[in-house]
């Protein structure tokens, strides 16, 4: 018999066996932890498979083999005896989502069925995790049926390369890691890190060439990851306006373009064209447009007779038209219209519904609705709790006006040196993802602002949280997510508690922030203010320094003990990890760096009291 007939017979047998056992469904052994959590897992009695049992990959006619993981890619594509991995495209008895799939495990093998190659890819990624757990913990994968699909169609993370670039190899590995956790998009804030060919003066010396970026985007596309550019415009334009003084709104500031100078658009459109050519497979062009501080103040703008807000929205219409004409959907940060309307601070607040109801007023937005391009996606960014009353009201306003909205949470908000805090901000990722799913918004983006220069490895738990909660926002709480993250990333079982050190490290870095100052803020990210450093001991007046800084010394002693606890936790984690030791090494050096103020304070105390 030809292979296609054999496969059909095998699929029929497996399906009948599965149906016969469906009356006896049970729960999945806790040693198998899938991330993201599938929508439905049914487990049945009977013999399953071990990670070594699969002997080949077979496809139905017209079904491609997607990019496979390490444990399945080694399997031959020719049918042979034994248990196989069977792949088939079908529109029957599968989820409606193009990324959905059904995965069946039986003693005959594994079947993955999906509508599209993307669904097959994700089904095989889920199988890869099952095989890993079978290998790592010596357990048989039980007979089961997984029916799975995403709650949110567009699940993106943000790359902010304003301040530094990693090696290209790192970005390839990043794509693999994102795909593993079913993140399907990247919005890349390029700044000057693309080698612009139309405006070569803009690119930094270490910028990525368009050809290098095209190759990376092609690699990502094969793994169902779509990369789109973010090219800042109107504001945040220092990387451009340091070269083009003639386009500044304020000659003393490189922050904003003049939106009334036609040459502004000549430069911006050239940069857009280069970015679109470098990233040819994305659907979006993010045009920035946030945090404008002063437009409408020079003679070119005054001559138009337009207000600052009107000038901003005229700019937005022009850049949106460009995006649409070039086959992209424009995205725009939405803070400036909210500031114009006087509701920005309210949207950021956590005021109760009763408090919000008394002051909520969108009349200025209502009057200006004709200025809002309908083709634009308004990126509603809120980096902490997104479920507040004012925020929900704003989302309803967008919906009522027929405007498209995408959510933006933060895996790194840019305000923390060393690393993001609060469980790598995963609770905020979860909360906004749930809101996006409930309101059927255009998608969700986990931003990763680099202002505080955290090592990107310290942001990854937040990225993986976006994979988890963008796919299935409600299945797990944060504690359960952290345990599954530890297993998937490092091979630690939940009862090992091997990542507890990370909770302690997040606490420790708070002391670093203010350890050496008595007033003000010296946080190396945004928010720096005038500050006063602690003084030095006076050898002519021993003990006075220690008395003055008694509280800091007491806290430093606590943090010294915490440092040792963290160091021991990392040492054990490195010894027992099955993978990703590099991330643990980054945490180790982060711990050493954040401990510097502790050691300095204790050394000064020793000197003062010697």
Language model: regions and residue ranges:
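Substrate-binding cleft of carbohydrate-active enzyme catalytic domains
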Residues: 151-336, 342-354, 377-379
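Extracytoplasmic/secreted envelope proteins and their assembly/folding machinery
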Residues: 65-68, 117, 121-124, 128, ...
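Positively charged n-region of N-terminal signal peptides that target proteins for export
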Residues: 1-12
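Bacterial N-terminal signal peptides
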Residues: 12-20
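Substrate-binding groove of N-acetylhexosamine-processing glycoside hydrolases
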Residues: 28, 34-37, 41-44, 59, ...
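Contiguous, structured surface segment used for ligand recognition
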Residues: 26-154, 247
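Short, Φ-rich (hydrophobic/aromatic) sequence segments
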Residues: 38, 67-74, 124-131, 170-177, ...
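N-terminal small/glycine-rich loop or linker at the start of catalytic domains
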Residues: 143-162, 406-415
């Amino acid at each position: 018999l030809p292979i296609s007939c054999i496969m059909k017979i095998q699929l029929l047998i497996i399906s009948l066996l599965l149906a016969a056992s469906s009356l006896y469904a049970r729960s999945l052994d806790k040693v198998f932890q899938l991330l993201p959590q599938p929508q439905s897992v049914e487990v049945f009695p009977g013999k399953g498979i071990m990670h070594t049992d699969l002997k080949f990959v077979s496809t139905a006619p017209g079904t491609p083999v997607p990019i496979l993981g390490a444990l399945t890619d080694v399997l031959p594509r020719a049918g042979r005896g034994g248990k196989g991995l069977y792949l088939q495209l079908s529109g029957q008895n599968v989820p409606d989502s193009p990324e959905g799939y059904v995965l069946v495990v039986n003693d005959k093998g594994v079947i993955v069925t999906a509508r599209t190659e993307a669904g097959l890819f994700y089904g095989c990624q889920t199988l890869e995790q099952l095989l890993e757990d079978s290998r790592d913990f010596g357990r048989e994968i039980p007979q089961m049926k997984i029916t799975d699909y995403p709650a949110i169609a567009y699940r993106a993370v943000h790359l902010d390369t304003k301040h530094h670039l990693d090696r290209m190899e790192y970005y390839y590995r990043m794509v693999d890691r994102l795909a593993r956790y079913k993140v399907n998009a990247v919005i890349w804030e390029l700044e000057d890190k693309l080698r612009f060919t139309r405006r070569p003066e803009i690119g930094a010396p270490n910028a990525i060439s368009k050809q290098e970026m095209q190759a990376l985007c092609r690699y990502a596309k094969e793994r169902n990851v779509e990369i789109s550019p973010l090219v800042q415009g109107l504001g945040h334009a220092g990387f451009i306006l340091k070269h083009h003084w003639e386009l500044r709104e304020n000659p003393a500031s490189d922050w904003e373009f003049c939106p009334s100078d036609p040459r502004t658009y000549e430069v911006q459109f050239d940069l857009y064209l280069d970015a679109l050519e470098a990233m040819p497979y994305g659907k979006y062009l993010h045009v920035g447009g946030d945090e404008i501080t002063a437009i409408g103040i020079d003679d070119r703008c005054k001559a138009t007779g337009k207000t600052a807000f009107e000038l901003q929205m005229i700019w937005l219409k022009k850049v949106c038209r460009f995006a649409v004409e070039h086959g992209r959907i424009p995205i725009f940060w939405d803070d400036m219209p909210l500031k114009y309307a006087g509701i920005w601070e309210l949207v950021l607040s956590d005021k109760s519904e009763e408090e919000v109801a008394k002051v909520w007023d969108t009349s200025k937005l209502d009057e200006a609705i004709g200025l809002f391009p309908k083709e634009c996606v308004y990126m509603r960014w809120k980096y902490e709790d997104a479920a507040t009353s004012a925020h929900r009201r704003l989302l309803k306003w967008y919906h009522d006006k027929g405007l498209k909205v995408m959510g933006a949470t933060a895996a790194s908000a840019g305000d923390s040196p060393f690393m993001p805090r609060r469980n790598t901000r995963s609770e905020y990722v979860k909360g906004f993802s749930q809101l996006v799913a409930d309101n059927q918004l255009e998608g969700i983006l986990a931003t990763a602002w680099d202002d505080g220069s955290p090592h990107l490895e310290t942001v990854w738990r937040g990225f993986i949280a976006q994979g988890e909660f963008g796919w299935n926002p409600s299945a797990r709480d944060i504690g359960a997510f952290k345990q599954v993250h530890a297993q998937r990333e490092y091979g630690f079982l939940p009862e090992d508690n091997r990542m507890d050190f990370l909770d302690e490290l997040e606490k420790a870095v708070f002391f670093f922030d203010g350890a050496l100052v008595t007033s003000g803020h010296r946080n190396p990210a945004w928010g720096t203010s005038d500050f006063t450093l602690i003084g030095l001991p006076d050898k002519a007046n021993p003990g006075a320094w220690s008395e003055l800084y008694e509280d800091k010394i007491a806290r430093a002693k606590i943090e010294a003990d915490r440092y040792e606890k963290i160091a021991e936790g990392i040492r054990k984690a490195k010894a027992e990890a099955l993978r990703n030791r590099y991330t643990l090494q980054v945490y180790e050096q982060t711990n050493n760096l954040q401990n510097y103020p502790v050691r300095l304070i204790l050394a000064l105390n020793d000197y003062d009291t010697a």
